[in-house]
């Protein structure tokens, strides 16, 4: 007679044997990799260089802010930049890390806009994007945390499938659409929030707070509400 424990072991053994050994090892290694991930505030020139290079290579020209202004924003407290890093298995140097990606967030009052998230090409099969979002959702749990994506409902867009995939990724990670879109310097963007929402006026104020003087006027003239 089999008891319940024996049956569970048999089922587990059968399912494991259906997986190729190499595939199983890859799944286990990928699972282990995710738990070594850390988000570290920039403290070195090396981190800044890594972030700058990935930033330049990951986003379209029309969507990028001048990197120097982002660094100034960090000093002013308007921006928060993290280097996504994995601790190396190096017994000789236990404080050695590998660069895996970046996050750049814009802060104002209780609002946090995840302005940029990028993972290095070689690290994209390990679930680092989802793990990073988990870290950020916990880190900003006392804020209204949201992000922008290109309008995923524009079927005429050249990168329509990519937009759809990006939206599905964020929805899978617990984000949901705001009741409005925005025209951001000529690009229609959807706003996705994590258990939150905000008024368009608050969203606009967040951007105006980035820069002073002439830029405030430029922002007012180039960011518009798009009703759904």
Where are these regions (language model features)?
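Short amphipathic alpha-helix that is part of the acyltransferase structural core
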Residues: 27-67, 202-206, 221-223
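Active-site rim helix/loop that mediates acceptor-substrate recognition in acyltransferases
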Residues: 56-91
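A conserved beta-turn-beta hairpin within the catalytic core of GNAT-like acetyltransferases
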Residues: 107-114, 124, 143, 188
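Conserved acetyl-CoA-binding loop-helix of GNAT-fold acetyltransferases
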Residues: 119, 125-139
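Conserved GNAT acetyl-CoA-binding A-motif
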Residues: 140-162
């Amino acid at each position: 007679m089999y008891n319940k424990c024996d049956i569970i072991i048999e089922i587990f053994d059968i399912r494991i044997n259906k997986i190729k050994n190499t595939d199983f090892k890859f799944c286990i290694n990928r699972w282990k990799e995710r738990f070594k991930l850390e988000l570290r505030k920039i403290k070195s020139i090396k981190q800044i260089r890594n972030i700058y290079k990935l930033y330049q290579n990951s986003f379209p020209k029309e969507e990028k802010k001048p990197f120097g202004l982002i660094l100034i924003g960090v000093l002013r407290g308007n921006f928060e930049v993290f280097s996504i890093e994995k601790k190396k298995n190096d017994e000789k140097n236990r404080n050695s890390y590998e660069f895996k990606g970046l996050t750049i967030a814009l802060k104002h009052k209780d609002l946090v806009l995840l302005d940029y998230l990028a993972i290095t090409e070689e690290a994209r099969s390990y679930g680092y994007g989802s793990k990073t979002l988990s870290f950020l959702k916990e880190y900003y749990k006392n804020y209204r945390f949201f992000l922008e994506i290109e309008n995923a409902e524009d079927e005429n867009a050249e990168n329509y499938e990519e937009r759809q995939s990006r939206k599905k990724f964020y929805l899978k990670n617990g984000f949901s659409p705001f009741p409005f879109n925005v025209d951001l310097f000529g690009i229609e963007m959807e706003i996705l929030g994590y258990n939150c929402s905000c008024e368009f006026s608050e969203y606009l104020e967040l951007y105006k707070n980035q820069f002073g003087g002439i830029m405030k006027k430029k922002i007012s003239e180039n960011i518009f509400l798009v009703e759904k």
